[in-house]
From Swiss-Prot:
Family: Belongs to the RbfA family.
Keyword Transport among record annotations: no
GO biological process: one example: maturation of SSU-rRNA
Subunit structure: Monomer. Binds 30S ribosomal subunits, but not 50S ribosomal subunits or 70S ribosomes.
Localization per record: Cytoplasm
One Pfam family it belongs to: RBFA
Claim: Cytoplasm is one of the keywords in the record: yes
Gene that this polypeptide is encoded by: rbfA
Keywords assigned by UniProt, alphabetized: Cytoplasm, Ribosome biogenesis
Role: One of several proteins that assist in the late maturation steps of the functional core of the 30S ribosomal subunit. Associates with free 30S ribosomal subunits (but not with 30S subunits that are part of 70S ribosomes or polysomes). Required for efficient processing of 16S rRNA. May interact with the 5'-terminal helix region of 16S rRNA.
Segments passing through the bilayer: none
Protein name: Ribosome-binding factor A
Gene Ontology cellular component list: cytosol
InterPro entries named in the record: KH_dom-like_a/b (IPR015946), RbfA (IPR000238), RbfA_dom_sf (IPR023799)
Source organism of the structure: Herminiimonas arsenicoxydans
Length: 128
């Protein structure tokens, strides 16, 4: 289950989780845009009125041009994606989708490397 802010009510969390699951399937199996490669939907944040949804995704590449192309591909396909979501979800207001590259995984890897380097330096200093 995705992490969410505490200000969203329980139903909003369930809607965001369902949108995340459905978006993952739509992007993986139905979206044909060549700009959108292998991505993972990591989190969906829905506004309380369900008018907007911020969709966070990660991808294997850290290349800024590829990320930009992926965001533009997802944004261009947002009408199609919303249509597919509308067929799957039974909510009155279908949110407008805003796609954002999630950098938390890359930051976590960088932090892990820094910790490993600090531990290696500490071990080396202890040996001396």
């Amino acid at each position: 289950m995705a992490k969410h802010s505490k200000s969203i009510p329980g139903r909003g969390l369930r809607v965001a989780d369902q949108i995340q699951r459905d978006l993952s399937e739509i992007v993986a199996f139905e979206l044909k845009d060549p700009r959108v490669g292998m991505i993972t939907i990591t989190e969906v944040q829905v506004t309380p009125d369900y008018a907007h949804a911020k969709v966070f995704f990660t991808m294997l590449s850290d290349n800024k041009d590829e990320i930009k192309n992926t965001v533009s591909g997802l944004s261009a396909a947002s009408g199609y994606i919303r249509g597919q979501l509308g067929r799957r979800l039974s909510i009155h207001t279908l949110p407008e989708l805003h796609f954002v590259h999630d950098t938390s995984t890359a930051r976590g890897i960088e932090m892990s490397k820094l910790i490993d380097e600090a531990n290696a330096t500490r071990a080396k200093d202890a040996e001396d």
